[in-house]
C-alpha cells in the first residue's frame, strides 16, 4: 500500500507545471485572483487570459 503514496507523489510532481518558467495564469487560484473563472471554453463577451492547470479548462474574463 505504501507504493500508492509514492506513485501519487511522483505523478503530482511530474504533472505539475514548473512555476519558475511561466508567468501565465495556470491554476484556479490565480485565475480567481485576476478576476476570471475556469470554464471549458470562453463564450459570449469573455476572453481567455490563461488556463486553469489542465488542458481543457480555460481562465476566462469579461472583456
UniProtKB/Swiss-Prot annotation:
Major site of localization recorded for this protein: secreted
Propiece span(s): 21-22
One GO term describing the cellular component: extracellular region
Disulphide connectivity of cysteines: 31-59, 38-52, 42-60
Swiss-Prot/TrEMBL keywords: Antibiotic, Antimicrobial, Cleavage on pair of basic residues, Defensin, Disulfide bond, Secreted, Signal
Pfam families membership: Defensin_beta
Induction pattern: By bacterial infection.
Compartments (UniProt record): Secreted
GO terms of biological process kind: defense response to bacterium
Residues in the signal sequence: 1-20
SUPFAM superfamilies: Defensin-like
Tissue specificity remark: Highest expression in salivary glands, epididymis, ovary and pancreas and to a lesser extent in lung, liver and brain. Low or no expression in skeletal muscle and tongue.
Family, per entry: Belongs to the beta-defensin family. LAP/TAP subfamily.
PANTHER family recorded: BETA-DEFENSIN, DEFENSIN BETA 4A
Function: Antimicrobial activity against Gram-negative bacteria E.coli and P.aeruginosa.
Name of the featured protein: Beta-defensin 3
Species for this entry: Mus musculus
Highest classification ranks of the organism: Eukaryota, Metazoa, Chordata, Craniata, Vertebrata
Gene assigned in the entry: Defb3
Amino acid at each position: 500500500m505504501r507504493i500508492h503514496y509514492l506513485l501519487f507523489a511522483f505523478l503530482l510532481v511530474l504533472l505539475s507545471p514548473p512555476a519558475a518558467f511561466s508567468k501565465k495564469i495556470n491554476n484556479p487560484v490565480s485565475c480567481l485572483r485576476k478576476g476570471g473563472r475556469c470554464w471549458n471554453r470562453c463564450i459570449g463577451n469573455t476572453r481567455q487570459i490563461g488556463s486553469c492547470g489542465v488542458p481543457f479548462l480555460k481562465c476566462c474574463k469579461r472583456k
